[in-house]
Amino acid sequence: MFYYLYDLYFNHLDSLRIFSYVTFRALMAGLTSMFVTFWLGHKVIDFLYGLKFRESVRDDGPKSHESKKGTPTMGGLLIIGSLLLSVLLWGNLKNSNIIVLSVFALCFSALGFADDYMKSVKKIKGGMKARTKFLLSILISLVFCILFFYYTGVIPTGHSGKIPFQITDLFFPFVKGPVLALGVFAIPFSILVIIGSSHAVNLTDGLDGLATGTVAISVVTLGIIAYVSGTPITANYLNIPYLPGAHEYSVFLSALAGALFGFLWFNAHPAQVFMGDTGSLFLGATLGMIVILLKKEILLLILGAIFVSEALSVILQVGSFKLTGKRIFKMAPLHHHFELGGVKETKIVIRFWIIAVILAIISLSTLKIQ
């Protein structure tokens, strides 16, 4: 909104030109969402508690989790609300992909909310039927992909920088230029990325602050990548694809990072609120959508290796038990394996954060090492 008002009424005033700078608006977006989250945090927690939106605990889960029972959930409402408000204030709403990101983040959050509502209010064990949830995820992802690949993601001829590419091309880390031309397979591949990412983050959200912190680190990293990818000088210097308008995604990502750091204030151990599927589904899906916009789908395997390992641990555990009758891990997802192994919850979370920072550094290094 501020950018729109400046561009419409005040672009002749040099003193207000700062509102046109992406770096300034990104920083302000992060601070705004963070302080909105701080300000509304206790109010939202009390509101959720009053409505009996409370967490239930797995019967077969670690005994230490019994104390978490009854903690308010659906805190993802706080994250998505702060994010959208900040983007509305500081984002360039003329950038169609900012609108698309915001709308589809809200769609995934609504899907997660419906699942949480069924579990915590309707007391339906397991919440929404897995098949229904999966099909709705596919539908939302499909609409996003159609909009991006056929409308908002089309790059005008002559605006691809030093590295020419098609929007359906696939890039690999440490490799200069596109590796595969996906063509018609770009949409099903992208749907797989979004759904895989959303469910992987959902599985990671099992300890106080674990998903919040690791996603925040990934979001900050992608914000840096978005900025350099959307700036022709840096994109050409680094020999990465120049994506017109991508630097505006850094405003969206900064707002999301601010909301996550603000939420972590209340979600750190011992958690006063959980994000629930309302938060984890939309956060994972947003990571997936962002890497598609930035042509960094494969990089997410490195940057989000924690989420990948959490999802793989569940797949391996289920597969091993069905085939051999034996379990590989004490419990899946992976963080519960360490927990049952005697490692304290806070130590697991902090170690995972450290690993996430290392993965972020490696991911950023791929911009130059190729």
Swiss-Prot record:
Signal sequence bounds: none
Residue spans crossing the bilayer: 31-51, 73-93, 98-118, 135-155, 177-197, 209-229, 251-271, 273-293, 298-318, 347-367
One GO CC term, this protein: plasma membrane
Catalyzed reactions per annotation: UDP-N-acetyl-alpha-D-muramoyl-L-alanyl-gamma-D-glutamyl-meso-2,6-diaminopimeloyl-D-alanyl-D-alanine + di-trans,octa-cis-undecaprenyl phosphate = di-trans,octa-cis-undecaprenyl diphospho-N-acetyl-alpha-D-muramoyl-L-alanyl-D-glutamyl-meso-2,6-diaminopimeloyl-D-alanyl-D-alanine + UMP
EC number: 2.7.8.13
Cofactor: Mg(2+)
Gene Ontology biological process terms, A to Z: cell division; cell wall organization; peptidoglycan biosynthetic process; regulation of cell shape
Membrane topology category: Multi-pass membrane protein
Subcellular localization, as worded in the UniProt entry: Cell inner membrane
Pathway named in the protein's UniProt entry: Cell wall biogenesis; peptidoglycan biosynthesis
InterPro entries, per database record: Glycosyl_transferase_4, PNAcMuramoyl-5peptid_Trfase, PNAcMuramoyl-5peptid_Trfase_CS
Alphabetized GO MF terms: metal ion binding; phospho-N-acetylmuramoyl-pentapeptide-transferase activity; UDP-N-acetylmuramoyl-L-alanyl-D-glutamyl-meso-2,6-diaminopimelyl-D-alanyl-D-alanine:undecaprenyl-phosphate transferase activity
Residue ranges that the Swiss-Prot or TrEMBL entry lists as coiled coil: none
Keyword Cell membrane attributed: yes
Keywords annotated in UniProt: Cell cycle, Cell division, Cell inner membrane, Cell membrane, Cell shape, Cell wall biogenesis/degradation, Magnesium, Membrane, Metal-binding, Peptidoglycan synthesis, Transferase, Transmembrane, Transmembrane helix
Superkingdom to which the source organism belongs: Bacteria
Primary localization class, coarse: membrane
PROSITE patterns recorded: MRAY_1, MRAY_2
Family to which this protein belongs: Belongs to the glycosyltransferase 4 family. MraY subfamily.
Functional summary from the UniProt entry: Catalyzes the initial step of the lipid cycle reactions in the biosynthesis of the cell wall peptidoglycan: transfers peptidoglycan precursor phospho-MurNAc-pentapeptide from UDP-MurNAc-pentapeptide onto the lipid carrier undecaprenyl phosphate, yielding undecaprenyl-pyrophosphoryl-MurNAc-pentapeptide, known as lipid I.
Protein name, entry field: Phospho-N-acetylmuramoyl-pentapeptide-transferase
Source organism: Leptospira borgpetersenii serovar Hardjo-bovis (strain JB197)
Gene: mraY
